[in-house]
């Protein structure tokens, strides 16, 4: 089976199983993953899924570094997008383009899709500019993210 299809299947299956204190796995994860791969082609997107205090599920405490701060800003951006009527960023898909490492959100997106696309685009650009520290991958959240 295509890895992309497995990713979508996992997102659909895992999201209802999460604890109530955790946000559901985003269904637009596939698009965000592709944006990250556009701006950071030399590192697997998976390295960003469990990084620091904010990259991945949840988010609390002080970001451990600039990359983690990118994820905190992305979380806050989604919180702002949720203020748009009937906008659920974790489930919203959008139109965008990747060309030679440059991301562009397309003009045909409605207000919610445009906001979510811009959140993801800015996060992917931020990831590209922030150093990656292997010591901040898969950290003990209880110990380091209070």
Swiss-Prot record:
Query: What's the catalysed reaction?
Result: a 1,2-diacyl-sn-glycero-3-phosphocholine + H2O = a 1-acyl-sn-glycero-3-phosphocholine + a fatty acid + H(+)
Among Gene3D superfamilies, the record links this protein to:
Phospholipase A2 domain
Q: Which cofactor does it need?
A: Ca(2+)
Where are the disulfide bridges? 38-98, 53-145, 55-71, 70-126, 77-119, 87-112, 105-117
Enumerate the SMART domains for this protein: PA2c
Active-site annotation: 74, 120
> Propeptide residue numbers?
22-27
What GO terms in the biological process aspect are recorded for it?
Answer: arachidonate secretion; fatty acid biosynthetic process; lipid catabolic process; phospholipid metabolic process; positive regulation of fibroblast proliferation
Give the enzyme's main class according to its UniProt record, as a single word.
hydrolase
Q: Where in the cell is it found?
A: Secreted
Q: Which is one GO molecular function term here? A: signaling receptor binding
Any idea of its EC number? Answer: 3.1.1.4
Listed InterPro entries: PLipase_A2, PLipase_A2_Asp_AS, PLipase_A2_dom, PLipase_A2_dom_sf, PLipase_A2_His_AS
| Positions that bind Ca(2+) | 54, 56, 58, 75
Swiss-Prot/TrEMBL keywords: Calcium, Disulfide bond, Hydrolase, Lipid degradation, Lipid metabolism, Metal-binding, Secreted, Signal, Toxin
Annotated signal peptide? 1-21
Subcellular location, principal:
secreted
Where does tissue-level expression of this protein occur? Expressed by the venom gland.
Q: Does the keyword Aminoacyl-tRNA synthetase apply?
A: no
Q: How is the cofactor bound?
A: Binds 1 Ca(2+) ion.
Question: What family does the Swiss-Prot or TrEMBL record give for this protein?
Answer: Belongs to the phospholipase A2 family. Group I subfamily. D49 sub-subfamily.
Protein role:
PLA2 catalyzes the calcium-dependent hydrolysis of the 2-acyl groups in 3-sn-phosphoglycerides.
Name of the protein described by the UniProt record: Neutral phospholipase A2 B
- Give the species this sequence originates from: Naja sputatrix (Malayan spitting cobra)
């Amino acid at each position: 089976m295509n890895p992309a299809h497995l990713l979508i299947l996992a997102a659909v299956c895992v999201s209802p199983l999460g604890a109530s204190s955790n946000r559901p796995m985003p269904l637009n994860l596939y698009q965000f993953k592709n944006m990250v791969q556009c701006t950071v082609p030399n590192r697997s997107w998976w390295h960003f899924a469990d990084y620091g205090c904010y990259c991945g599920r949840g988010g609390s405490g002080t970001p451990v570094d600039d990359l983690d701060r990118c994820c905190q800003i992305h979380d806050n951006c989604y919180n702002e997008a949720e203020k748009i009527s009937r906008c659920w960023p974790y489930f919203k898909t959008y139109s965008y383009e990747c060309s030679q490492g440059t991301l562009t959100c397309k003009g045909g997106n409605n207000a919610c899709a445009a906001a979510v696309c811009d959140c993801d685009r800015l996060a992917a650009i931020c990831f590209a500019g922030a150093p990656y520290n292997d010591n901040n991958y898969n950290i003990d959240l209880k110990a380091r993210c209070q």
